[in-house]
Structure formats: structure tokens, C-alpha cells
């Protein structure tokens, strides 16, 4: 899980979603998981 100020899609499988006001990236590649913090 990477925590960054700006989350970006890395590949075409990445999806940007909002959970409880937190912007997250979920992907089939576990290394692409990010959240905004």
C-alpha cells in the first residue's frame, strides 16, 4: 500500500474508488495499491 498525495492509475487494471472519503486505487497487481493521505 503506497500512501501518496496524488493517486494515479499505473496500468489499465487500476481503478480509482472512494471509500469513506478516502481515495484509493485497487488493482489486480498488488503493488499498485495506493491511498491518498
From Swiss-Prot:
A Pfam family the protein falls into: Ribosomal_L36
Annotated GO biological process: translation
Keywords: Ribonucleoprotein, Ribosomal protein
GO molecular function: structural constituent of ribosome
A cellular component annotation (GO) from this entry: ribosome
Superkingdom, natural source: Bacteria
HAMAP family xrefs: Ribosomal_bL36
Sequence similarity: Belongs to the bacterial ribosomal protein bL36 family.
Protein's name in the database: Large ribosomal subunit protein bL36
Species per Swiss-Prot/TrEMBL record: Acidovorax ebreus (strain TPSY) (Diaphorobacter sp. (strain TPSY))
Gene that specifies this protein: rpmJ
Amino acid at each position: 500500500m503506497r500512501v501518496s498525495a496524488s493517486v494515479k492509475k499505473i496500468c489499465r487494471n487500476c481503478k480509482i474508488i472512494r471509500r469513506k472519503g478516502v481515495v484509493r486505487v485497487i488493482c489486480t497487481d498488488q503493488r499498485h495499491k495506493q491511498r491518498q493521505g
